[in-house]
Amino acid sequence: MRLFPQLFCQLTHLYVGEAWEDAAYRNQSLAQVQESFDNDIRMSSRVIGGVNFIALDNGYYLFEEDQLAFLQSEAEKGLPMVLMMHNPLYEKEFYEQITYHREQIGLRPSSNLPCAYLTGVPAELMGHYDDHRRRQQTPDEVTLRTIEWIRSCPLIRAVLAGHVHYSHVAKLTEDVPQIITSVTDVRVITVT
């Protein structure tokens, strides 16, 4: 018996090999990786203390149609929701910090202007990305619809993310914080 309920969220580096990082690449080893987890690592939920914690796989900067449908069906429960995902969602202030002010926030400097490694960065802000990163991180229509749904859903209380190895709290909307954690962070979050 587990002392605490567990819910795992997919991480970018769970899958093996080197290839174009997308759903097809992920699916090459998904079944093997999935065997190690109790929940579906692409999308799953668990209600803990009256809060619906939802894990979504956006490890390759995209959401899929079935994930949006899953979110919408989870909202039908009417419970407060906390989303967990690997890559943070685009938020202007955080994008500017991680792209243009890396050294001031404690990240290593880059010899060229880096990409932000966020899901949903507007295409017009990707002009300085190298070709590989621009193609990898350009949001598709489903991803943009999913992000818009997340921003507009009144049940979402917070988004928890990581990936960028930097701690930051951003306002995804006026009422929804996006809490980005580094590998050494421990946070206590109160959900109302």
Each predicted region: which residue ranges?
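Low-complexity, serine/threonine/proline-enriched polar segments
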Residues: 104-142
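Functionally important transmembrane alpha-helices
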Residues: 148-163
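Extended active-site neighborhood of metal-dependent phosphoesterases/phosphodiesterases
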Residues: 1-82, 96, 100-117, 152-155, ...
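Extracytoplasmic/secreted envelope proteins and their assembly/folding machinery
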Residues: 68, 143-147
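Active-site-flanking ligand-binding surface segments in enzyme catalytic domains
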Residues: 140-144, 170-171
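Small/polar loops that bind or transfer phosphate-bearing groups
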Residues: 55, 138, 162
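Feature marks short, surface-exposed loop/turn motifs that line or immediately flank catalytic pockets
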Residues: 14, 89-91
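Histidine-centered catalytic micro-motifs
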Residues: 82-89, 159-167
